[in-house]
Regions:
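Flexible, glycine-rich surface segments
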Residues: 199-201
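Short Pro/Gly-enriched beta-strand edge/turn motifs at strand-loop
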Residues: 130-132, 162-176
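Residues that flank catalytic or metal-binding motifs in active/ligand-binding sites
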Residues: 4-9, 94, 143-146, 184-189
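Conserved beta strand-loop-helix elements of the APE1-like EEP
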Residues: 100-105, 138-163, 193-196
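Conserved S-adenosyl-L-methionine
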Residues: 109-117, 160-169
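Short consensus segments that form the blades of beta-propeller domains
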Residues: 85-89, 138-141, 179-182
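A Trp-anchored, charged/polar loop motif used as the substrate-binding/catalytic surface
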Residues: 44-56, 174-193
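N-terminal, active-site-proximal structural segment of metallo-dependent hydrolase catalytic domains
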Residues: 1-130, 134
Length: 201
């Protein structure tokens, strides 16, 4: 195989909402109905079908690395559960759906891992937002907005040598009379080593 290059793809998975449902709220009492609308709107985008379509594109191009944006999770849990977010019933997991569909297509990919300090493990994902709120459906809704990098698992000749996850100093905020949400941004950096040509970031 020719290792004179590392092929990289970037893909926005689209979590299914831009949170416009909450942008114009005027009172806190309106918030649960907006959460319900976000929940139903996300599911209406047919996340599993979208993940399958993205998997077909990746399988066709077969890049070594794929950077995923808005690779989000949607979960539900007991109504009015206390902070921090704890809802665990998975309604959508775009990364898991994508990896499952890629496996079906014979194009195995996975998240990357590297050993961190004190026997910890660093994963090639980064959480931008992990928020949970009550809905009018009788349960809490939790949205976890993530970025991730996945890599081919059928190529042992390209090895991971470094993986770093960083935060931006500035944050995005959604603020109105009903709610204030802080969305920190950041990035994931990896270095893959190709035996004949050295590191490729």
């Amino acid at each position: 195989m020719d290792y004179d290059r590392v092929v990289v793809m970037t893909l926005n998975m689209d979590e299914g909402t831009d949170f416009k449902e909450i942008s114009g709220l005027q009172t806190p009492d309106q918030f649960p109905a907006a959460v319900t609308a976000i929940y139903h709107n996300i599911l209406a985008t047919k996340p599993d079908e979208r993940a399958a379509a993205m998997a077909r594109v990746i399988a066709e191009k077969h890049p070594d690395l794929v950077a995923l944006h808005e690779a989000s999770m949607l979960r539900t849990g007991p109504l009015n559960a206390p902070h921090p977010p704890s809802a665990s019933k998975v309604e959508m997991n775009l990364i898991s759906s994508l990896l499952r569909e890629l496996e079906k297509l014979g194009a195995p990919y996975d998240l990357m891992y590297i050993s961190g300090p004190a026997q910890s493990v660093i994963e090639s994902t980064r959480t931008n937002l992990d928020a949970e709120a009550p809905s009018t459906c009788g349960f809490n809704v939790r949205i976890t907005d993530r970025d991730a990098i996945i890599a081919r698992t059928d190529n042992d000749d390209i090895q991971l040598t470094a993986l770093e996850v960083h935060d931006f100093s500035d944050v995005q905020t959604i603020t109105n009379p009903a709610v204030s949400i802080v969305i920190p941004g950041g990035w994931i950096q990896v270095v893959k080593w190709t035996p004949d040509f050295g590191p490729a970031a």
